[in-house]
Amino acid sequence: MDKLQKMISEKSVVIFSKNSCCMSHTIKTLFIDFGVNPTIYELDEINRGKEIEQALAQLGCSPTVPVVFIGGQLVGGANQVMSLHLNRSLVPMLKRVGALWL
């Protein structure tokens, strides 16, 4: 989907989320606590959110929220993000794309 690709490529960190999802809240909080200013798309609030969710599923995202893209690349969901954080790979990745300055 062209719209999805445009959304992903416009910012260094993009999170697809739903307000009703506790794991989405956790992932958003993690990035914000790092000092990152992610672009967040709440799929339960935006136009064509269901369509975007289906496009994420076609990319292999399961569950479809939260889904994180860093530097235009699919990182994955909460499990993948937390694994990167715990093995200390997340911060260097954020620095490489200019999302984190420290």
Curated annotation (Swiss-Prot):
It comes from the Eukaryota. InterPro entries: GlrX-like_pln_2 (IPR011905), Glutaredoxin (IPR002109), Glutaredoxin_subgr (IPR014025), Thioredoxin-like_sf (IPR036249). It holds the Pfam family Glutaredoxin. Its main location: cytoplasm. The keyword Repressor does not apply. GO terms for biological process: response to nitrate. A motif (Responsive for interaction with TGA factors) lies at residues 99-102. It is found in: Cytoplasm; Nucleus. CDD domains: GRX_GRXh_1_2_like. Keywords: 2Fe-2S, Cytoplasm, Iron, Iron-sulfur, Metal-binding, Nucleus, Redox-active center. PROSITE patterns: GLUTAREDOXIN_2. [2Fe-2S] cluster binds at C21. Residues 1-101 form the Glutaredoxin domain. One of its GO terms (molecular function) is metal ion binding. Disulfide bonds: none annotated. Gene3D superfamilies: Glutaredoxin. GO terms for cellular component: cytoplasm; nucleus. The keyword Metal-binding applies. Belongs to the glutaredoxin family. CC-type subfamily. May only reduce GSH-thiol disulfides, but not protein disulfides. PANTHER family: GLUTAREDOXIN. This is Monothiol glutaredoxin-S4. It comes from Arabidopsis thaliana. The lineage of its organism: Eukaryota, Viridiplantae, Streptophyta, Embryophyta, Tracheophyta.
